Amino acid sequence: MKTVFLRLQHALDVTRRADFLAPLALRLYLAPVFWMAGSQKLADMPATIEWFGNPDWGLGLPFPELLAWLAALSEAGGAVLLLCGLAVRWISLPLMVTMLVAIFAVHWPNGWQAIADPSAPFANAQVLEAGEKLARAREILREYGNYDWLTSSGSFAIVNNGIEFAATYLVMLLALFFGGAGKCLSADFWIAQKLR
């Protein structure tokens, strides 16, 4: 039995040769996410700054101009760095901060779910109400619209805007912060090799 276990463990250990694939996958997944977030902020900085600072319909953050620029540049620049695998542990820090701000300043009041699904775990009252509203919207669209055409690109959903995506990105960034960019396919790896 011990021999079987050792052989299985050896076979499993052989896969460590490809352990660079996990951080590479995280980087490739996160790069377009942060590129879109950062470039959208940069495309209209006056509106972004106003949203960061306005306490009535925005985030109500102090120093909105500074924080908006820091967030936008961290996200857009971070996307490029993640893609190249350059300074990944360093850029993970400000990106984690932006995710924490997103979680607590934007998404927290909406609960966990990003897309309202009353049958999923962590459904709050807002999500439970969304199911009834979605059913009514579908009835209206079936009666008064071309429902088949309207749903030909996908079904309708109600966006709940909960913390789910921001929390997921935070966990992914945490893994990159502690594990680094990975070997072989990252600039960090090759720079470290040159410095040794």
Give the location of each predicted region.
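Perimembrane loop-to-helix junctions flanking transmembrane segments
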Residues: 49-63
